[in-house]
Regions:
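Juxtamembrane extracytoplasmic/periplasmic/luminal helical "stalk" adjacent to the first N-terminal
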Residues: 1-29
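Short intrinsically disordered, low-complexity coil segments enriched in acidic
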Residues: 1-7, 13, 42, 125, ...
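Short hydrophobic alpha-helical segments used for membrane anchoring or interfacial signaling
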Residues: 18, 59-67, 162-171
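Amphipathic coiled-coil signal-relay and dimerization helices
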Residues: 24-26, 67-75, 170-173
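Signal-transducing coiled-coil linker helices
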Residues: 31-42
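Solvent-exposed, extracytoplasmic
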Residues: 41-53, 128-173
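Extracytoplasmic/periplasmic ligand-binding sensor regions of membrane-associated signaling proteins
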Residues: 50-141
Length: 173
């Protein structure tokens, strides 16, 4: 069921965070580390994980020290990565940076997108403890359409059933 798909997202996240290339980029001495063939191969790996999993809309790792992102779209500073994903509009960049990149959320969480829209994200960081500043932050955006399709499949066809998503902070959706 749905749990299986969410678990797959979590295991992809672990695989990417523990990847040697993530360790290299976390301790990058300068910004040129983000334009190496290895960094681009890492981006390709994310692209392949996305292609293999219809639940995943986007995957990227954020490196706060350099304000740089390596993701399915390539390797860019956070602003340019956002522009690439938003049809070159910078509207919403500040919110995205504070709600997603610099969020305190760990694991699955919903973030407001627009007026009545919420989007499901998965977020992990290294180090995992909040006492130290994160060196790398992994974000996976969940594909809403696919998520809703799975919810529909999980629901029996009578009208009296509800499905709840309970986050680790005990937030109910």
């Amino acid at each position: 069921g749905i749990d299986h798909y969410l678990f797959t997202i979590q295991s992809s996240a672990s695989e990417l965070l523990l990847n040697n290339q993530n360790m290299v980029l976390q301790s990058a001495e300068d910004i040129s580390a983000f334009s190496t063939p290895e960094a681009y191969r890492y981006s390709e790996l994310m692209k392949n994980i996305k292609i293999a999993n219809s639940m995943i809309e986007d995957i990227y790792l954020y490196y706060p020290v350099w304000d740089y992102i390596v993701g399915t779209e390539g390797c860019y500073n956070s602003r340019n990565y956002f522009l690439l994903n938003s049809g070159l509009s910078s509207k919403g960049y500040a919110e995205w940076k504070s709600h997603i990149l610099e969020s305190d959320n760990i694991n699955f969480f919903f973030s407001p997108l627009g007026k009545n829209e919420e989007k499901l994200y998965f977020r992990q960081q290294i180090p995992a403890s909040r006492e130290r500043d994160p060196q790398s932050i992994l974000i996976i955006g969940v594909n809403d359409t696919e998520f809703m399709r799975l919810l529909d499949m999980a629901l029996p066809n009578d009208d009296g059933t509800s499905i709840f998503v309970l986050t680790e902070e005990e937030q109910l959706y």
